[in-house]
Curated annotation (Swiss-Prot):
PANTHER family: RING FINGER PROTEIN 207. Transmembrane segments: none annotated. It comes from Caenorhabditis briggsae. It comes from the Eukaryota. This is Probable RING finger protein 207 homolog. The keyword Hydrolase does not apply. Keywords: Coiled coil, Metal-binding, Repeat, Zinc, Zinc-finger.
Length: 836
């Protein structure tokens, strides 16, 4: 019957001021009489220095908790199970009062728990050093701390502070783990206690062995008397030693069981009804005591001293060997039986040692006959099982190494297969063991007939039995190891199933990277590679065109959103457009120069040109000496709706007279042929023609590229210039008085424009709606123009130099020489104007 752990082992009463000794025994303070040693472990006086016993706070807490009485209901003052406790009201309630008093909505926020869940705080809830309530728990020192303790700790040590709730959960987990270990320790010690108790109960076997010994010794009185006395003394001595050892170990185990029960009871109370603060304060002490108890060990079981007739006969055979000639090799081996069969697999197989003493010839004779036939039924399958077991053992060992050392991923099916094979071998070994047991009856008859061979056959038989036991134990261990690997393998496979998609499948490459990989994977001269490169270039070109279209659309939208300012209109009678779309005839004549002074009808909604551009064009017009008197040929200009609405208004011209003067050829411009010999009356009057000629010269000097290709855009023509030209045409070229006044106004506007060019501003004018509507109605307009103007002045020095030099004229030199001629002409013109 188990004792109450809250009772003293000396006075057999409940603890009063319990104290704890270093051996983990707890007694009353008055029972110890101030002795530093425990009377339970050592009843006599102890000469060794022991630690001073300390008050047992854990036992005191259990005593206080065990004496706690259930509180009455605060409303009806009765105890009716089940009982509840309202933490908000701090009152106990029965079931009826709870339903009556806490059903209103105002009590819905009250926290009501059962009385079993309520934990009363028996220890202090305030800090001993600062008298402040506990707010945190330190996991390093395993103590509760207040706000002052927290502020007093340095910053690098504050990482160990956790909340009381987290500390409570952590301590409960540790207590559960320690209690589980302690329960296992208790079960082992209880089993050892029962084994030793059974050994004491088998004392009657010694008397039977003594009687059989006397009967055997009577057969050989003279020789065996000495052996008898010796064996009897040894038996008595073994019995005394066994009894003494068992009694001593029983006392040790019983002494350990008391603290074990106390610690288990403490763990149960702390995990169920103890408050959080009590658990946090008492958990370190309980952990320490449990660790001390787990470190205690008990001596091994004594060797069984139960006499065996076979052992006695072997000793007698040794003593009678000089007389009877019996060798000890004919006697069976002595099997020492231990209390625990767990070490049986550790004993080495003695069959090889025993067989080494026998010759091959004797072994062949012993295995012949009926015994050999019976034994062959087990021997051959057993050898096969040994090979299979060795293979499976090696596989399990390699699997365990892959799992623990090599960190490999093992399939669950492989482990299950190993488990099945181990179970199969274990079943086969069990069947062979049963077959061996069944052979014993048949072998007894053979042993009776052949006494000399029985000894050797018994040796072989017993060794095989031991070998089977060893193999079965090994198979059990392998099976246990294989079963232990199953959850780990399942866990690893589950984790691998989650990680494998991310680890095995690389991310998709970018579109350009995939295209490049596809292109590089194709052979250099293959048609697929060429098509892929062309496709990529086409896509890139389309993307660039789309970007340009978007930019142009944005610019046009921004231009449309701008408001047009009101500016003065400038009318110039000599404002003309030069068509640079040249078509050279075989004789070198540019048909586009037949009517270079085409008047353009500009819409009132078009943007005005800057003053600087207008001035530059006026100077060029004066240099080329354009006059309306020389216009003889008539050119019809048709203005289309599309051209009229564009920013650079173009005219489709229909020439009535195709006879034109030839332009100077490229050889003349380069100086190879005298330019003066080929000068016609209509060369040089077109600015576009001159620029086109220069472009031809430059193109000959260097290959055409997008950078050196020049594009000349046509200028917008003022509407006033067009109207003046129409009036001059209708009035036979003579300006009227109103036209003269309008020309004077235009000159004034030009002067104003010149002053505005200094500010670099673009002047816009507001367009009237009526003018726009009127201009839109006139879709096409036909104009007639005069003959082209005379050839501009070109200094003779340029042609002389060109004719003298045999070198080719470079691009830069050609530009410089033409510009010098233009500057010389401008200076001469300015000098003539100043003289006038």
């Amino acid at each position: 019957m188990e004792e109450n752990p809250l009772r003293c082992t000396i006075c057999k009463n409940d603890f009063e001021e319990p104290i704890l000794f270093s051996c983990q025994h707890t007694t009353c303070r008055k029972c110890s009489n101030g002795s530093p040693s425990c009377k339970t472990c050592s009843p006599g006086p102890s000469t060794s220095r022991s630690h001073t016993p300390q008050p047992d706070k854990l036992a005191a807490f259990l005593l206080d908790a065990s004496k706690e009485e259930m509180e009455q209901c605060a409303n009806c003052e009765q105890i009716t199970l089940p009982m509840f406790y309202c933490e908000t009201c701090q009152q106990s309630l029965c079931l009826a009062c709870r339903n009556v008093t806490h059903q209103a909505r105002m009590f819905s926020s009250h926290k009501i728990i059962s009385s079993e869940e309520r934990s009363k705080v028996y220890s202090s809830s305030l800090c001993k050093d600062h008298n402040e309530p506990y707010i945190l728990y330190c996991s390093d020192v395993r103590k509760l701390v207040c706000i002052q303790c927290f502020n007093g700790r340095p910053l690098e040590e504050r990482h160990s502070f956790i909340s009381i709730e987290q500390g409570h959960r952590m301590c409960l987990e540790k207590i559960e783990q320690s209690a589980a270990k302690l329960r296992f320790y208790q079960s082992e010690r209880q089993e050892e206690l029962n084994v030793r108790q059974r050994i004491l109960d088998e004392a009657s076997n010694f008397d039977d062995a003594k009687t059989s010994l006397y009967q055997l010794c009577q057969q050989i009185i003279d020789t065996v008397m000495t052996t008898r006395e010796t064996l009897a003394k040894e038996l008595v001595k073994q019995q005394e030693q066994s009894d003494e050892q068992c009694k001593r170990q029983i006392k040790e185990i019983e002494a350990v069981m008391g603290p074990v029960r106390l610690c288990l009871f403490s763990a149960q109370i702390l995990c169920t009804t103890a408050s959080k603060l009590d658990v946090l304060q008492l958990c370190p002490q309980l952990q320490k005591r449990i660790s001390v108890l787990l470190d205690k060990t008990v001596d091994k079981l004594p060797v069984s001293s139960t006499p065996d007739s076979i052992e006695v006969r072997s000793d007698l055979a040794k003593s009678l060997e000089p007389y009877l000639g019996m060798s000890a090799a004919w006697c069976p081996i002595s099997v020492s039986r231990e209390g625990s069969s767990s070490n049986s697999y550790k004993r080495g197989s003695g069959s090889h040692k025993a067989l080494s003493m026998l010759s091959k010839f004797q072994t062949t004779i012993d295995l012949a006959g009926a015994f050999g036939q019976l034994f062959g039924k087990v021997e051959h399958p057993l050898r096969q099982l040994v090979v299979e077991l060795s293979s499976i053992s090696q596989q399990v060992l390699e699997t365990q190494r892959d799992l623990t050392i090599r960190r490999c991923i093992i399939e669950k099916e492989d482990v299950e297969k190993l488990v099945k094979m181990c179970k199969k071998i274990e079943a086969s070994l069990g069947m062979h063991s049963a077959a061996l047991d069944g052979m014993q009856s048949e072998m007894q008859e053979i042993w009776q007939e052949q006494l000399d061979r029985v000894r050797r056959q018994q040796i072989i038989y017993r060794e095989k039995v031991e070998e089977i036991l060893n193999l079965r134990e090994t198979a059990r261990q392998i099976l246990t190891a294989a079963k232990q690997m199953v959850p780990y393998v399942s866990c690893i496979l589950n984790m691998n199933a989650m990680i494998a998609p991310k680890r095995c499948h690389p991310p998709d490459p970018a579109p350009m990277e995939s295209i490049c990989l596809e292109i590089t994977g194709i052979e250099p001269n293959s048609q697929n590679r060429i098509m892929a490169i062309e496709k990529e270039e086409e896509n890139r070109r389309l993307n660039q065109e789309a970007k340009k279209k978007e930019e142009l659309a944005g610019q046009s939208a921004a231009m449309k959103s701008l408001k047009h300012g009101k500016t003065k209109r400038k009318e110039m009678h000599h404002r003309m457009m030069l068509n640079t779309n040249r078509e050279r005839s075989p004789g070198g004549t540019d048909s586009a120069l037949t009517s270079p002074c085409i008047r353009r009808l500009t819409s009132t909604a078009l943007k005005e040109e800057t003053a600087s551009e207008l001035d530059a064009e006026e100077i060029l017009d004066e240099i080329f000496e354009l006059s309306g008197e020389q216009y003889e040929e008539v050119v019809d200009g048709t203005l289309t709706e599309e051209d009229r609405c564009s920013s650079a208004l173009l005219l489709s011209l229909e020439l009535q007279n195709e006879s034109v003067s030839p332009l100077p050829s490229l050889e003349q411009l380069l100086g190879r042929i005298s330019l003066a010999s080929r000068v016609t009356s209509d060369i040089g009057f077109s600015r576009g023609a001159m620029l086109q000629s220069l472009n031809d010269v430059f193109a000959l000097q260097k290959p055409p590229t997008p950078e050196n290709i020049s594009v000349s855009e046509e200028r917008n023509v003022l509407a006033s210039a067009v109207r003046n030209a129409e009036k001059r045409k209708s009035g036979a070229g003579l300006p009227t008085t109103s036209e003269k006044e309008e020309m004077i106004e235009n000159d004034e506007i030009i002067v104003e424009k010149e002053t505005e060019t200094e500010k670099k501003k673009v002047i816009r004018r507001r367009v009237k709606k009526a003018e726009c509507e009127q201009s839109e109605e006139d879709v096409t307009t036909t104009f007639t123009f005069g003959p082209p103007p005379d050839c501009p002045f070109v200094p003779q020095e340029i042609f002389d130099k060109l004719g003298e030099s045999d070198e080719k004229l470079g691009t830069f030199e050609a530009k410089e020489r033409v510009l010098q001629s233009l500057k010389q002409k401008m200076n001469q013109k300015n000098g003539i104007d100043n003289d006038n």
